[in-house]
């Protein structure tokens, strides 16, 4: 999705809406992680405005782009984005009930609770590996049914913690080997962890590490919309998976706590929030977003709706047999032969039967 009708000033206001919703929700809950959403708000705003293909009115659209927040502790980033773009599954009341018992807006995003959350991301690095799997699935489906039907990207936001986890190393190696060019990882390179500077815990050169895995790599200022646009555009043109390191300030907009571990995993406090509002030139009451900013965000989803309708027309053009095969593959329903095989046959027979039923199927063994 390309939408270049908005200027940097409008983007800044849209990003600030993410920031104030974040600090208000975390403050109300007296718990949460405001720093990452505040720091990555500019990158996320540009991504959703100009690149991400999505339709809030049909969140299960098969050919939507996938957006995975692997750094799930910064969950207010995705909750704010889904609310602002018009997903009906998340209301302002849910934002106000952030991290409360029984609320959809848990401290870490949970799959199945809110449309638009593609996978549960609690353990760091898990979302990264999930995103690799999603990109593998996209390529296999596209090869079978054609780019007119399956042609989408997978975007994944990660932090330093995700990249420290062993699972990210294994998944990154696999993605590079598979040359998953539709996978774009956005690294929040803020140099801060919960304990302080990341120098205390890690000294990896992440860019060189991902180059060694066979990835396309780039770095940019995460608060410069033109720079963000440039590197994402280059990533979309690459035949390799892309690792984009965005230098950001954790807690961007917070005069006293921004750039420090103090805003990583704790509320900013009432006094600092007032200073943030002043710094961002934001005069609204807590949880109030100006109508003009809401309208700007909601328009993004309207274009996605048009793309989804065009896709539906292409789907209708498939031959009946191919169309039914596509629907069966997406449903991934197992027939009775599979269930019988699970009880009576050895592993290979089970796999062969599942493959004949589902059509698109990955399996691996360690012997």
Per-region residue spans from a language model:
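Glycine-rich ThDP/TPP pyrophosphate-binding loop and its adjacent helix/strand module
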Residues: 56-57, 113-114, 119-299
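Thiamine diphosphate
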Residues: 1-154, 295-367
């Amino acid at each position: 999705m390309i939408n270049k009708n908005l200027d940097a000033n409008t983007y800044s206001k849209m990003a600030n809406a993410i920031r104030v919703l974040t600090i208000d929700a975390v403050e109300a809950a007296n718990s949460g992680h405001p720093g990452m959403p505040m720091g990555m708000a500019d990158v996320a705003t540009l991504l959703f405005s100009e690149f991400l293909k999505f339709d809030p009115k049909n969140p299960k659209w098969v050919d939507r782009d996938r957006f995975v927040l692997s750094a799930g502790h910064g969950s207010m980033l995705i909750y704010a984005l889904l609310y602002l773009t018009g997903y009906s599954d998340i209301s302002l009341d849910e934002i106000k009930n952030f991290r409360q018992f029984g609320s959809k807006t848990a401290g870490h995003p949970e799959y199945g609770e809110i449309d638009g959350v593609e996978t549960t991301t609690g353990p760091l690095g898990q979302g990264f590996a999930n995103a690799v799997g999603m990109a593998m699935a996209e390529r296999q489906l596209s090869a079978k049914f054609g780019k007119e039907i399956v042609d989408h990207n997978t975007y994944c936001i990660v932090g330093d913690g995700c990249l420290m986890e062993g699972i990210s190393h294994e998944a990154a190696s696999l993605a590079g080997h598979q040359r998953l060019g539709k996978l774009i990882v956005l690294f929040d390179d803020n140099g801060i962890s919960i304990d302080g500077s990341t120098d205390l815990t890690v000294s990896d050169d992440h860019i060189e590490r991902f180059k060694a895995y066979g990835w396309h790599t780039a770095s940019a200022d995460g608060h410069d919309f033109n720079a963000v646009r440039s590197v994402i555009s280059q990533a979309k043109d690459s035949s390799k998976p892309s690792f984009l390191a965005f230098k950001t300030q954790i807690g961007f907009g917070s005069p006293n706590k921004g750039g420090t571990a103090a805003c990583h995993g704790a509320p900013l406090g009432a006094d600092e929030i007032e200073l943030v509002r002043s710094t961002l030139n934001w005069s609204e009451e807590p949880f109030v977003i100006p109508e003009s900013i809401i309208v700007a965000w909601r328009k993004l989803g309207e274009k996605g709706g048009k793309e989804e309708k065009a896709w539906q027309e292409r789907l209708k053009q498939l031959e009946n047999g191919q169309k039914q095969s596509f629907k069966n593959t997406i449903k991934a329903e197992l027939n009775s032969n599979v269930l019988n095989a699970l009880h009576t046959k050895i592993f290979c027979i089970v796999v062969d039967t599942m493959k004949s039923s589902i059509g698109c199927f990955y399996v691996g063994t360690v012997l």
